[in-house]
Amino acid sequence: MNDLKFDPNVKLILASARSHAMSLSHGQVTPLHLGVTLISDLTSVFYRAITSAGDGDISAQSVVNVINQSLYKLTKRNLGDTKVGVAVLVISLLEDSQISDVLKEAGVVPEKVKSEVEKLRGEVILRALKTYGTDLVEQAGKLDPVIGRHREIRRVIEVLSRRTKNNPVLIGEPGVGKTAVVEGLAQRILKGDVPINLTGVKLISLEFGAMVAGTTLRGQFEERLKSVLKAVEEAQGKVVLFIDEIHMALGACKASGSTDAAKLLKPMLARGQLRFIGATTLEEYRTHVEKDAAFERRFQQVFVAEPSVPDTISILRGLKEKYEGHHGVRIQDRALVLSAQLSERYITGRRLPDKAIDLVDESCAHVKAQLDIQPEEIDSLERKVMQLEIEIHALEKEKDDKASEARLSEVRKELDDLRDKLEPLTIKYKKEKKIINETRRLKQNRDDLMIALQEAERQHDVPKAAVLKYGAIQEVESAIAKLEKSAKDNVMLTETVGPENIAEVVSRWTGIPVTRLDQNEKKRLISLADKLHERVVGQDEAVKAVAAAILRSRVGLGRPQQPSGSFLFLGPTGVGKTELAKALAEQLFDSENLLVRLDMSEYNDKFSVNKLIGAPPGYVHWS
């Protein structure tokens, strides 16, 4: 027997069957010994298939009682497996006449058991995919709602519905929401809001890191990838793969000298046997994917642009309930609007909506942390009480000193006053804390009930959906409303995330003072001339002209798609032309370092123009 053709589980089963035959003093191992070994494992495919095909555990027990023979050596059947697996072993076993007779005698139909094994074998194939990935459709109910992006999702659906080259690749800057488009597709598949060819499809997010991990020998990575691709092919169009950072497929496992994944993917992608969604950034796509023309032409590009500030505000409003439920806080709408505006203005190294969402998330986490920490007023009083108790303990030892006795009396009186002041505050704090904790618990319960309601509606379980929608959920909603109404009187604890919390987080990220962030844009523009005069002395006409031009542009009186202002400062050396430009940059962009200064006196020579446009081809620094 060639052990290399059997997976480890089968080897264990065969060894166990052999031991069982030896314990019964039988001269050979027959299919019946193998049957006893398989059915004795309550988690095995054989046991589960018999219980499903028959009368549950009763049928399995009947089979155990009838089987008392030994095992017959099996050969691999043509089921497309590279190795003999447990499912193949069971199907081969069912074809044996002895086992068939035993099952019939036990009241179980062999054909029905075989069909159940085939069904379970399909689950095993899907489990192989899940080893290196995650089914996004299964998790769709727990994912964040996808607001907007309908055009991109529709484009992805259209590409997936093609006959060949049905592989969309999402291209966009980091943080614009490429993965969210795929999550939106998963939610549509779950709801059934997709064409027939995508109904019931599994959307598997493949992790190349998990596939590469532990591949110490050459060929191990390719073997894993081939098993995944074979599982997708056997699913016959019911599985769509998604790989984030698709450019990794062009370099996965190259360091060990192995073939990169793209060479294994190309044939199936071209024939349409594999439906595949990729995602990568513009820079990575240009650097890695475009260089491999054969790989690139098998994909259809779907560009994901950065959303505008109004679109970001809509996205934040859609995510509001999720973050409120997770953190147990309430988010004001003004905080969401300010988050989008401040992140666009001050956080320049990242993209919307990612930076705005992170801003809201951190603000919520900060407020939640403050809720879990004792208020400063109570903490200060408790420290004073502890300090006085220590002093009393020390003074009580000095009974002969009259001054100590007088001080002891004074300290005791002060301690009683502090305790009288601390007790009502502690009671109020505990009451407010209890209300907040109960509100958190009810909101979490509401989220769980909403997920259960969506599941009941998908399964068309009308009675259960009605009980949840008009019973349990409404009761929880009314309880939450009642608690939130009573929480409005909270003085010591606040669970509200407001604009001041957003401004505080932006200040921590950027170093810009909170007072400047809180300043209204309208007030800043009106006082622009005065602020410029604080730095530029004199030059009234120039300052007035600059301030008026900026004000006209910002209020919308200027031409659209034009700069806020274009100024030509003329005058002799030293009168303040550069200083006015620096002051203007400081007022508009909060730092004079954000001014790009080109000193044209440095460009007198012909060759110095290379400083602006770069070196010509063939010269150093050309790229």
Curated annotation (Swiss-Prot):
The organism's place on the tree of life at top rank? Eukaryota
UniProt region (Repeat 1), positions on chain = 6-71
Q: Does the keyword Ribosomal protein apply?
A: no
Positions of ATP binding? 172-179, 571-578
Q: Which UniProt keywords apply?
A: ATP-binding, Coiled coil, Nucleotide-binding, Repeat
Q: Which Pfam families match?
A: AAA, AAA_2, AAA_lid_9, Clp_N
Q: Which Gene3D superfamilies match?
A: Clp, N-terminal domain, P-loop containing nucleotide triphosphate hydrolases
The keyword ATP-binding is annotated on this UniProt entry = yes
Which family, according to UniProt? Belongs to the ClpA/ClpB family.
Query: Protein name, please?
Result: Putative chaperone protein ClpB2, chloroplastic
